Amino acid sequence: RVVTAIGDSIAAGYGLDSQEDNYLTLFSDNIGAVLNNDAVSGYDSGEVLKSLSDEKTAADIKNADAIVVSVGGNDFFHRKDIMIDALKNALLHGEGFFPEEVTNIYDEYEKNLSRIIDEIKNMNPDAYIIVQTVYNPFLKQTLNFSYINVGKTANRYVTRLNDSIKNVCKTKNRVFVFDVAPE
């Protein structure tokens, strides 16, 4: 069995003392699979999409029984200026308000994720594809800015991102969602 991972720092194991602690290594070892980890810290969905044309990544996908996709957080974290403005708008309009710039990020992400899945399926139609949701790194933080709880407000954005992941995946065959976001 072969598992190939593509995506961002979560899949790449950023910040871990050893790759042996990476959840993908633990998972692969547990099921007796070889892991090809082609994830790159900092990648957003557009960069992951481009990485599919990399010779090694393409070969790893073609030879995999399962492909794990971990991407989404950087689509937002790379656009801190827009997200800071969104937080300001939450102060003015309420926490449920999504500015057009943020909605555009979701739309772009959904298109990229759909294309990533379609390209993987073109390369390896028999592989299982597992797309993981995104966790909210601010959820447990108690930082309040005026009347807005940053963790709670960020959770609305992460929840919407995870809804995007689930909506894209449910339209695809042999694509499964691994939900890592706590309720």
For the regions a language model picked out, list residue spans one by one.
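Serine-esterase "nucleophile elbow" of acetyl-processing enzymes
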Residues: 1-41, 57-59
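Structural recognition of the beta-strand scaffold that forms the well-ordered cores
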Residues: 2-7, 35-39, 65-70, 128-133, ...
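Solvent-exposed loop/turn segments at secondary-structure junctions
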Residues: 9-12, 40-46, 73-78, 135-139, ...
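Extracytoplasmic/secreted envelope proteins and their assembly/folding machinery
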Residues: 24, 28, 49, 106, ...
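Oxyanion-hole/transition-state-stabilizing segment in secreted/luminal serine hydrolases
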Residues: 47-106, 136-137
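Hydrophobic, aromatic-enriched interface-forming segments
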Residues: 107, 112-150
